[in-house]
């Protein structure tokens, strides 16, 4: 007996030691996997900095840098008192503390103080900041998933976080904005709140709310996170009621839920109230409706359960089921009413009701609807695993993730930018699904191969995003982006050549660049806080020349106007000559006395895309939405509103609409139909391209592709443009090489030509500048940015 007892004890000790060894080994594997994931994540996020340079990316991050610098110089207190910045939204100025929130500035400064001993200044620190915090998200995602799933799923979540395209898109070095920090904090806060359901609800409730509370100081999408926590509380209460109906425990402590959620409700309210942008009045807004319902539900259910027990609680709630159902219907029905009275508006309304979008909201690329192609590029390789995870998310601790996944997927469809918001839920669900499928031995190898293939494809998608250059490097071009120093050259010129207090009018996309890099007051920027001023700028650009000049000089009090339009010269590509798209030869136009087509170089607007010509559609739409028939107060006829609303008055927008067409090969070009507006006069007059003659002079006269081919009469000296079909006939271009179909020109040719209003019929100037508008700057190297002075 004693011998047997000793033997059993020895075996137990050996088993315990073996288990301890396995645990230690597994801990080492997990630690190594997390370290490798973090290293890979940081490398991916900093690669574009190493390759393209230490640039702050896009537009919004520049104001974040500017305000971080201001905070470093003046302290944090101005965020809670306000400060006036006269160089933005000239001539009115703006108080940024009431428009933006301090979180981004603060996390940038945290990295600055960390790296300052190593010689980093603030600029370089804020370039590193988003990459560092976003890479650290591999640890918070591991923690989040480990709260409701096993460690294998948590490690997979960390790995997916390192390479996920949606994490990378707004987590690169230089993308100093709100998303990078939110993707780090949101899973941390949610994980801590889930932990609060299990133990120590006060401690974990405070920690979780602090993490999510800082999101309220960082990103406007905090309204979603705020309501997500409230909705998750409601879902957990509903789950508890269903379990009570079955006579079983809910599987979590309703006491812990009541305590932790009450802490969340009031502590988050403190974060929300502290900043000037929101303030205490936000707690009385519609955005606090679901969180307040959550508070009533969790506290009410806990008190009911504590007093009368599970079974009687269920019977009591069953009596009032119709009241609860009616409340849900009432909330849904109230949304359009609240939208009508502007209680919910702007991009927040566009998220809830995608069809309730103003022209300004629609004009922002990241507020457009998501597409199937974009969603595949973001999550395609892991969608099967996300679907496979859903049965595993029915446990109480995973219900917040399921709620996040369902609601986040809806918001991601309504706006492209919100594909990023759902990233933690999508990555966590994919990791859980992958781990669950790998447990099925029958499909083990097949699932493993599928997982490896998905990870490889995910990595390829992420790497493609990681290698793309910053917006300032490609001068804000797209489709495809082309590296160019045009905007950098233009901003340096503004900073050094314009009078010190000269304001510059521009479309709102470039306002931050003009003020922060160009050091000159701008009239509008990406904050889009003054729709009337944006509408006025749009109206000035899309009005007849003299009216537009008067609006800029008298109403907006500026005398410098910047415009941006990328364009390509086809004579730079020898292969296009065979298609008649450029020629260094003189071509006699048949037997017409003295008429010859001259050597020419064809210019194509908006290739690469991204300029003001494309955006002019939205300039007109916003101007019409802001003013309508009130354009009459600017000296325009009231009927001009109809002209603004109808793109065929000035702009050919697409192939599905009835109207003129212009096709090169199989590519439809967007072309102007009216050169009499101020913007089109600025963009398409030939003075802006004369500088290129030193490069392209062997090819003859530059000509916009929609104008036709320049021709002159050697006897009379008359000049004109001839339609492309006329040129093809006399230049003997083979039919298979006649790639231009349709034509816009000065002289209508039945069935082929569509006349352009304002196109010069007796010269090669296309359109001429008025005497009170002077071209003072053309950017290098491509001439994409121009600045005019109103004299």
Region locations from a protein language model:
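Extracytoplasmic
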Residues: 2-17, 35-38, 56, 61, ...
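Short hydrophobic/aromatic helix or loop-helix immediately within or flanking a transmembrane segment
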Residues: 63, 67-71, 85-119, 215
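Alpha-helical transmembrane segments at the extracellular/periplasmic loop-to-helix junctions
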Residues: 287-304, 321-401
């Amino acid at each position: 007996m004693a011998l047997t007892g000793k033997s059993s004890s020895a075996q137990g000790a050996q088993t315990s030691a073996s288990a301890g060894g396995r645990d230690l080994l597994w801990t080492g594997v997990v630690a190594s996997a997390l370290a490798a994931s973090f290293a890979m994540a940081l490398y991916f996020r900093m690669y574009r900095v190493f390759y393209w340079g230490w640039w702050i990316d896009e537009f919004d991050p520049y104001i974040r840098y500017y305000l971080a610098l201001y905070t470093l110089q003046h302290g944090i207190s101005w965020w809670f008192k306000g400060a006036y910045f006269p160089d933005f939204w000239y001539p009115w100025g703006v108080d940024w503390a009431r428009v933006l929130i301090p979180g981004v500035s603060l996390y940038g400064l945290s990295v600055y103080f960390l790296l300052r001993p190593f010689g980093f200044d603030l600029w370089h620190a804020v370039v590193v900041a988003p990459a560092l915090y976003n890479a650290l998200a591999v640890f918070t995602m591991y923690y989040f998933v480990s709260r409701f799933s096993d460690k294998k799923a948590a490690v997979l979540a960390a790995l997916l976080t390192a390479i996920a395209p949606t994490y990378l898109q707004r987590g690169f070095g230089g993308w100093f904005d709100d998303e990078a920090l939110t993707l780090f904090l949101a899973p941390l806060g949610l994980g801590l709140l889930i932990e609060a359901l299990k133990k120590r609800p006060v401690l974990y409730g405070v920690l979780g709310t602090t993490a999510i509370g800082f999101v309220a100081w960082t990103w406007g999408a905090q309204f979603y996170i705020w309501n997500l926590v409230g909705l998750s509380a409601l879902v957990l209460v509903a789950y508890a009621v269903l379990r009570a109906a079955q006579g079983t425990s809910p599987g979590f402590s309703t006491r812990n839920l009541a305590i932790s959620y009450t802490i969340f409700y009031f502590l988050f309210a403190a974060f929300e109230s502290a900043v000037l942008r929101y303030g205490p009045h936000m707690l009385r807004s519609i955005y606090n409706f679901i969180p307040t319902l959550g508070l009533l539900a969790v506290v009410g259910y806990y008190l009911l359960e504590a007093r009368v027990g599970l079974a009687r609680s269920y019977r009591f709630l069953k009596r009032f089921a119709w009241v609860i159902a009616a409340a849900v219907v009432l909330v849904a029905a109230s949304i359009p009413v609240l939208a009508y009275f502007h209680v919910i508006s702007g991009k927040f309304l566009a998220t809830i009701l995608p069809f309730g979008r103003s022209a300004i909201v629609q004009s922002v690329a990241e507020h457009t609807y998501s597409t199937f192609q974009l969603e595949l590029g973001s999550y395609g390789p892991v969608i099967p695993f996300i679907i496979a995870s859903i049965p595993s998310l029915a446990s109480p601790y995973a219900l917040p993730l399921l709620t996040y996944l369902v609601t986040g997927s809806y918001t991601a469809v309504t706006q492209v930018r919100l594909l990023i918001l759902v990233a933690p839920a999508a990555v966590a669900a994919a990791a859980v699904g992958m781990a669950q499928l790998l447990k099925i031995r029958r499909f083990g190898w097949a699932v493993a191969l599928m997982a490896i293939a998905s990870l490889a494809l995910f990595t390829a998608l992420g790497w493609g995003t990681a290698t793309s250059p910053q917006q300032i490097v490609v001068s804000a071009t797209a489709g495809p982006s082309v590296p160019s120093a045009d905007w950098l050259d233009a901003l340096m010129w503004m900073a050094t050549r314009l009078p010190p207090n000269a304001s510059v009018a521009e479309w709102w996309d470039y306002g931050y660049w003009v003020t922060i890099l160009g050091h000159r007051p701008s009239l509008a920027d990406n904050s889009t806080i003054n729709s009337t001023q944006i509408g006025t700028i749009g109206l000035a650009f899309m009005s007849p020349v003299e009216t537009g000049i008067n609006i800029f000089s008298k109403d907006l009090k500026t005398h410098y106007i910047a415009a941006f339009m990328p364009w390509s010269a086809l004579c730079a590509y020898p292969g296009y000559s065979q298609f008649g798209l450029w020629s260094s030869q003189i071509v006699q136009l048949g037997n017409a006395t003295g008429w010859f087509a001259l050597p020419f170089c064809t210019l194509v607007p908006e290739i690469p895309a991204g300029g003001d010509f494309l955006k002019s559609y939205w300039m007109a739409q916003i101007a019409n939405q802001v003013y309508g028939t009130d354009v009459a107060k600017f000296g325009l006829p009231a009927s001009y509103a109809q002209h603004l609303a109808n793109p065929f008055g000035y702009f050919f927008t697409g192939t599905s609409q009835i109207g003129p067409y212009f096709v090169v090969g199989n590519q439809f070009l967007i072309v102007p139909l009216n050169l009499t507006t101020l913007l089109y006069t600025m963009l398409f007059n030939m003075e802006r391209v004369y500088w290129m003659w030193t490069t392209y002079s062997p090819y003859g006269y530059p000509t916009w592709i929609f104008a036709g081919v320049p021709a002159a009469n050697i006897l009379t000296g008359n000049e004109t443009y001839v339609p492309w079909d006329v040129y093809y006939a006399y230049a003997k271009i083979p039919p298979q090489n006649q790639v231009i179909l349709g034509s816009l020109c000065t002289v209508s040719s039945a069935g082929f030509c569509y006349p352009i209003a304002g196109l010069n019929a007796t010269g090669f100037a296309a359109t001429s500048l008025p005497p009170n508008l002077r071209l003072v700057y053309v950017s290098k190297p491509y001439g994409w940015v121009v600045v005019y002075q109103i004299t």
